[in-house]
């Protein structure tokens, strides 16, 4: 359900509708799991501050994703400035009725996160929004601020890099220890 653009929605409605997507996008854009809550809050502080200025020229979802991408980019710049290394969290103990399945899922997610972290910001943003979040390319280009052909070019390059990294990860995973 997309919120109507002729009336200004309140922040609670925006958060309810877009919060889970923002959370996932932040994670895929390189925000450490331990920092996602804070960065997500930053996104919605900006949404709250700028919501009265939302003109509806794009969908609310596209507008929120644009804020999300800029906030994640700022986060990565601050992390570099503080000389932090954005790494995966230490492995957690698995407690489930299917520990092997849960562990495999967690490893796959960690592999994807490592692959995405290796992409430059421009390619990662396009790949995440198009391939993972399912936005159309016109919306992706509006969010990241590039021409349509550039968006397709970045997507093509990102797909090639992701495929190459995934094949390498599979080959490393199948080697005997």
Where are these regions (language model features)?
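Arg/Lys-rich amphipathic alpha helix in sigma70-family domain 2
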Residues: 53-55, 66-87, 105, 168-170
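A short, charge-rich alpha-helical start-of-domain segment used by transcription regulators
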Residues: 2-24, 37, 48
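Internal acidic/polar
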Residues: 82-105, 109, 136
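A short pre-motif secondary-structure segment
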Residues: 126-130
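Σ70-family region 2.3-2.4 aromatic/basic alpha-helix that recognizes the −10 promoter
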Residues: 19, 44-48, 58-78, 155, ...
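Short, Lys/Arg-enriched C-terminal cap helix and immediately downstream tail that follows
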Residues: 56, 77, 119, 159-177
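Helix-turn-helix DNA-binding module
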Residues: 3, 117, 121-122, 133-150, ...
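Sigma70-family region 2
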Residues: 2-5, 31, 42-59, 78-80
């Amino acid at each position: 359900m997309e919120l109507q653009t002729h009336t200004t929605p309140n922040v609670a409605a925006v958060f309810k509708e877009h919060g889970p997507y923002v959370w996932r996008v932040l994670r895929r854009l390189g925000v450490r799991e331990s920092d996602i809550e804070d960065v997500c809050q930053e996104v919605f502080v900006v949404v709250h501050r700028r919501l009265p200025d939302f003109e509806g020229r794009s969908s609310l979802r596209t507008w929120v994703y644009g804020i999300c991408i800029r906030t994640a980019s700022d986060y990565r710049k601050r992390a570099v400035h503080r000389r932090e290394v954005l790494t995966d969290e230490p492995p957690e103990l698995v407690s489930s009725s299917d520990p092997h399945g849960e562990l495999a899922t967690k490893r796959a997610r960690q592999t994807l996160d490592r692959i995405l972290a290796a992409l430059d910001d421009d390619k990662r943003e396009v790949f995440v929004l198009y391939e993972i979040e399912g936005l159309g390319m016109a919306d992706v280009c509006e969010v990241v601020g590039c021409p349509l052909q550039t968006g397709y070019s970045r997507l093509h390059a990102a797909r090639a890099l992701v495929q190459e990294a995934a094949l390498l990860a599979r080959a490393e995973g199948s080697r005997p220890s």
